[in-house]
């Protein structure tokens, strides 16, 4: 068991807990969890967390409740990849640090989302192009599918950002929450697919392996399937 790593997602979690007037009671709230990996203490996987290097960066726009959920997989990205940013999504009160990041000329931002939802004037890409030496910044909406569609639609500050539409036949292996669609990938699966697309195969496979290890450890401590 270890203290939680100091990264953007865990800082959002700490801030949300500090602001809350009552505890956030997720499923399994009675379980004594490792603060580092959010798995039950006796099944801690912190020692198995890989430190990865990649040619791309990630930016998670998170629904307000996501950092508080022990089943959140966006945290796994930040656990492994140090150049990961995270912000709580807001439609009107946008974090100025996020806006500065979107305009940072060191990065080429993309919103990772199905192309059919793009605005008519919005560029849709199926490949990652680090043009003019700019580092790809992949923005992932970390929420349920219903929430993510709303977030995408109601984020005018993303309207000029190219959409990266993943073309994958991969089915989700996420087993900690129920979904009506097997082709809806969870956040960390999207990140792994992006790493593959960028040619970072080793990082993609290591991140996917850590995700599978997290899922197996989490489920091994559950008394029943998630509802």
Model-derived regions, located:
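Short Cys/His-rich Zn2+-coordinating modules
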Residues: 11-27
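S-adenosyl-L-methionine/SAH cofactor-binding core of RNA-modifying enzymes
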Residues: 82-149, 153
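Short microdomains enriched in Cys/His and/or Lys/Arg
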Residues: 47-75
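Short Cys/His-rich local motifs and their 1-3 flanking residues in nucleic-acid-associated proteins
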Residues: 39-42, 46
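Short, acidic/turn-prone active-site loops that include or flank metal/cofactor-
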Residues: 65-66, 91, 166-171
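Short metal-coordination and nucleic-acid-contact micro-motifs, chiefly zinc-binding Cys/His arrays
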Residues: 30, 40, 54
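C-terminal folded domains that constitute the principal catalytic or ligand-binding module
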Residues: 137, 145-227
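Short cysteine-rich clusters marking metal-coordination/redox-active sites
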Residues: 34-37
